[in-house]
């Protein structure tokens, strides 16, 4: 997933807000390899400092992007007024982390096979309209980057400094997510005073932003005027 899974939301919101869709390091269209979640957080904070005076109204993030957002909130308590974190894991998975390199080492070549890509895409429960974006970008990601950000994601744990964030944090997870994501959502909510957790019935990983852009955009409007 990348900027394109927020494309429709941006189109809906752009009449009222300036919407910026960053590309995380190592993803298709990025200008440098992936190094760490913290490095991505620092880079986005630096961009906001330079172009936005150090503060924006709202930041949203899904999965790896949600982890980057959590790190940003930990590093800069007032980086945004509102934060929307979706399907972010903060419970490390040592086994998955250890298996990432050998698994991608043996199967990386398959990602350019459309039939295999369609099977992978179906397992993600994403709307069909996003397949071409998914396939194009997946084919452009280097193996080293894919391994790097998968390992970073499976090793990520919540920065204790998150408790000091000044942002109003809204957490979303799908009812049908795996247990690690649901447990993570509870852990994040418990770590951030005043945060709000919504578990969305019937949804899988990232299903809120990926498959219901109208509702996601409306939620942003409601949060931003709360």
Cite the ranges covered by each PLM segment.
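Conserved acidic catalytic loop of the alpha/beta-hydrolase fold
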Residues: 39-57
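Gly/Ala-rich beta-loop-alpha elbow adjacent to hydrolase catalytic centers
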Residues: 61-65, 69
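Flexible "cap/lid" loop of the alpha/beta hydrolase fold
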Residues: 70, 74-75, 80-110
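Conserved HGGG/HGGXW glycine-rich cap/lid loop of the alpha/beta-hydrolase fold
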Residues: 1-29
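Short beta-strand/loop motif that positions the catalytic acidic residue
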Residues: 165, 171-173
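Catalytic histidine-centered segment of alpha/beta-hydrolase-like enzymes
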Residues: 203-214
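Conserved alpha/beta-hydrolase "acid-adjacent" motif
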Residues: 178-184
């Amino acid at each position: 997933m990348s900027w394109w899974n927020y494309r429709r939301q941006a189109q809906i919101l752009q009449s009222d807000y300036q919407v910026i869709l960053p590309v995380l390091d190592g993803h298709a269209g990025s200008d440098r390899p992936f190094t760490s979640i913290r490095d991505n957080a620092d880079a986005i904070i630096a961009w906001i400092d330079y172009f936005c005076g150090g503060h924006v109204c709202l930041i949203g993030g899904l999965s790896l992007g949600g982890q980057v957002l959590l790190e940003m909130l930990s590093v800069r308590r007032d980086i945004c007024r509102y934060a929307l974190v979706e399907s972010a894991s903060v419970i490390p998975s040592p086994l998955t982390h250890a298996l990432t390199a050998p698994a991608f080492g043996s199967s990386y070549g398959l990602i350019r096979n459309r039939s295999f890509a369609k099977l992978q895409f179906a397992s993600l429960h994403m709307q069909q309209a996003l397949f071409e974006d998914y396939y194009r970008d997946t084919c452009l990601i280097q193996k080293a980057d894919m391994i790097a950000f998968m390992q970073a994601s499976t090793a990520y744990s919540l920065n204790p400094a998150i408790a000091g964030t000044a942002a109003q944090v809204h957490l979303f997870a799908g009812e049908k997510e795996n247990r690690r994501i649901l447990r993570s959502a509870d852990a994040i909510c418990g770590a951030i005073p005043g945060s709000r957790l919504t578990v969305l019935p019937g949804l899988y990983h990232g299903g809120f932003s990926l498959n219901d852009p109208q509702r996601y955009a409306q939620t942003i409007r409601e949060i931003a005027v709360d």
